Amino acid sequence: CYGDLLQHLTGSKDHNVALREAAVRQGLSVSEYGVTVVESGEVRTFATEEELYAFLGYAFIPPELREAAGELEAAREGRLPVLVEPGDLRGDLHSHSTWSADGKGTVAEMAAAAHARGHEYLALTDHSHYLREGRLEAQAEEVAAVNARLAPFRVLRGIEANIRADGSLDVADETLAGLDWVVASLHTAFDSSPTERILAAIENPHVDCIGHLTGRRLSRRREADVDVERVAARAAETGTSLEINSQPDRLDLRDAHA
C-alpha cells in the first residue's frame, strides 16, 4: 500500500479531507492503509498514487495542486492545468550577482550555470543603488565579454529599480531606456499606498516587470496590502509582466494569484 501511504503523507490535510469526503459519497473509505469498499469490506491497496487516484475516478493530481481548491473536480473533469517544469524554462529574468551585496556569484559564474542548464538567456538585474557612479557602465563591459564567450547564450543587461514612496523610480528614464530588461520593485514603505505606487511604476514605458509584487518575506514580513486584481488588469493593458518569484522565502506572486 505504498501509494496509499505516500498520498496520505504528502497531503495537504485539506486535500485529504476533501478526498475522503468525496470517497464516502461513493461508498468508499480512504485511509493510509488503502481504500475500503464499505458494503463488502473489501480493502484495495495501490502501489502508486496514480493507481489510487484512478480507482477513485480522478486523473493524477500533482502534489503542488493538492490544496482543496477545486482540484478534485478539475481532475474528474479533465481540467487540471499543465504545470511548468524546470525543462520548460528558457531563462531567468531576475538575478543578482556580486555587483549587489546579496549576490553570490559573478556574472561569468551565473551565466555559465544558466548556460549549463540549457537556458537561452539570463537577465542581470542587480539592485540599482549598487550600480551608481559608473558601476553600471563597468558592468556592461563585463556582460559584453561574457556574451562574446557564450554566444548564442545571452546575458541581458538589466536592473532592479526601487519604487519610491511617491511611485517614481530611483533610476533616470534615460538610463532605463538603454537596458534590455527593467524590474521595478517595492523595497521600502510597504504600508504607504503600495497599489498606487505599483500602478505608477507600470505606467513607466521602460518598466518591463514588477518584482515580488506584495513584498512578503515568509516568517519575516507580511505582504503589503496590494490590490492584485487591479494591478494585474493594468499590467495586462500595458504589457507589463508580474514576476512569480520562487525564492523559498518569497513565493510572490502566490500560487492562487498565478
Language-model region placement:
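Phosphate-backbone recognition surface of nucleic-acid-processing proteins
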Residues: 1
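Extended substrate/RNA-proximal surfaces in nucleic-acid metabolism proteins
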Residues: 6-89, 134-238
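Residue-level detector of anion-binding/catalytic polar loops
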Residues: 29, 120, 241
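Conserved short loop/turn motifs at secondary-structure junctions
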Residues: 38-40, 127-133, 246-250
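Histidine-centered catalytic micro-motifs
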Residues: 88-103, 124-129, 209-215, 246
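Active-site mouth loops of central-metabolism enzymes
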Residues: 92-109, 185-191, 221
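Metal-associated gating/positioning segment near the N- to mid-region
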Residues: 101-131
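C-terminal structured "cap/appendage" subdomains that terminate the fold
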Residues: 244, 248-251, 255-258
